């Protein structure tokens, strides 16, 4: 996959910016809060339809504007496609592919594939379980666009079930029939989500473990384990068996759920356990080890997306490359070579290995405006 052109209109601090990408590596240089991350955020939105930094679309629309627009020309397997996303400050989106409007957001997923590595990703190791669930779901959305509808349905059912749990039993009357209905819905959709997550981890683990061994010099062994609230002996287990176990787990927590007024069983509470040599990775205090682990996860994600789609995704590195030592920089460069288009943000070029700068397109970002940098090197 190759991103040829990007047009940001009233997006974040960009009023009307056009960028042509002319090399496999593009380095965006500028001080903090100038718009480097905003550009990567726009590309990530095209890939996942989600922003990790904004709770609502109105945060993405430039102050004083009614709507924002992201347009892109991407090349997939040698064929060019025109993409457009419009975000309205009052809510609502419109999506177009090659000029054709789409009714469902899931039909847009898969048009762009991207792997993002930013300082926020250290939360995969040291953060709450939600960070790891969000990462896993983000990978699934790119590999299986229909997963978006599954997650949205599950969230709606969870919301309805929690509302019923919060009702006063005396005021609500007999909740048993209603609860049985929502239990069955939660079990059906929840079991589909957890089975997909577990299968994805099965595919990611050997890839991540291999990358981790290479980066750490073979000194450590990485493991990825899905820990669902519902017993799951095998990700390939019969869906009906998993649903039955799901319902049994709900019944076991019924009293606690009524007391707390919230659902305690389901993929919204599951954990993804990252281990190093059999010990929880969050117990490792070294930031170097944490970065090694996250880098291995991201390289595994990149490799799996390429395996499934037959085309390497974009790689977006947000202010992390300069923080990697030369060994890790070289491991990453060896992994992507020239076949993976990479967009990198940084405040300075001094910590970059010369191999990263060779042939790179270097752009200066200042107050929402982008221009070629005097530091740009000729294309190799």
UniProtKB/Swiss-Prot annotation:
Gene3D superfamilies: P-loop containing nucleotide triphosphate hydrolases, RecF/RecN/SMC, N-terminal domain. It is found in: Cytoplasm. Belongs to the RecF family. It holds the Pfam family SMC_N. One of its GO terms (biological process) is DNA replication. Keywords: ATP-binding, Cytoplasm, DNA damage, DNA repair, DNA replication, DNA-binding, Nucleotide-binding, SOS response. One of its GO terms (molecular function) is ATP binding. GO terms for cellular component: cytoplasm. It comes from the Bacteria. HAMAP family: RecF (MF_00365). The keyword Oxidoreductase does not apply. ATP binds at residues 30-37. This is DNA replication and repair protein RecF. The lineage of its organism: Bacteria, Bacillati, Cyanobacteriota, Cyanophyceae, Synechococcales. NCBIfam families: recf. It comes from Synechococcus sp. (strain JA-3-3Ab). The RecF protein is involved in DNA metabolism; it is required for DNA replication and normal SOS inducibility. RecF binds preferentially to single-stranded, linear DNA. It also seems to bind ATP. Its main location: cytoplasm. The keyword Nucleotide-binding applies.
């Amino acid at each position: 996959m190759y991103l040829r052109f990007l047009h940001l209109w009233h997006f974040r601090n960009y009023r009307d910016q056009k960028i042509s990408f002319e090399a496999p590596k593009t380095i965006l240089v500028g001080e903090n809060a100038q718009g480097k991350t905003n550009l990567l955020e726009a590309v990530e939105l095209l890939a996942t339809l989600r922003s990790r930094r904004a709770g609502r679309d109105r945060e993405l629309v430039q102050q004083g504007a009614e709507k924002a627009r992201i347009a892109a020309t991407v090349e997939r397997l040698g064929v060019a496609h025109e993409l457009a996303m419009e975000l309205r400050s009052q809510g609502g989106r419109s999506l177009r592919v090659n000029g054709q409007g789409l009714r469902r957001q899931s039909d847009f997923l898969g048009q762009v594939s991207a792997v993002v590595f930013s300082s926020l990703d250290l939360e995969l190791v040291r953060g709450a379980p939600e960070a790891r669930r969000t990462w896993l779901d983000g990978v699934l959305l790119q590999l299986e666009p229909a997963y978006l509808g599954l997650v949205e349905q599950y969230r709606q059912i969870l919301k309805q079930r929690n509302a019923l749990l919060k009702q006063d039993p005396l005021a609500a009357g007999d909740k048993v029939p209603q609860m049985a209905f929502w239990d069955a819905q939660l079990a059906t959709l929840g079991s589909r989500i957890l089975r997909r997550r577990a299968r994805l981890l099965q595919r990611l683990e050997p890839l991540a473990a291999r990358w981790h061994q290479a980066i750490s010099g073979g000194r450590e062994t990485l493991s990825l384990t899905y820990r669902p609230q519902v017993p799951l002996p095998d990700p390939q287990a019969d869906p009906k068996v998993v649903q039955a176990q799901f319902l049994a787990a709900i019944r076991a927590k019924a009293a606690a759920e009524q007391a707390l007024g919230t659902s305690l069983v389901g993929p919204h509470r599951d954990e993804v356990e990252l281990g190093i040599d059999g010990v929880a990775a969050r117990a490792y205090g070294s930031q170097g080890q944490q970065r090694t682990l996250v880098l291995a996860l991201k390289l595994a994600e990149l490799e799996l997306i390429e395996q499934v789609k037959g085309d390497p995704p974009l790689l977006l590195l947000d202010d992390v490359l300069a923080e990697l030592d030369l060994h890790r920089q070289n491991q990453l460069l060896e992994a992507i070579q020239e076949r993976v288009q990479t967009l990198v943000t940084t405040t300075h070029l001094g910590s970059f290995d010369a191999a990263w700068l060779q042939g790179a397109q270097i752009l200066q970002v200042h107050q929402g405006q982008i221009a070629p940098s005097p530091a740009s090197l000729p294309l190799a």
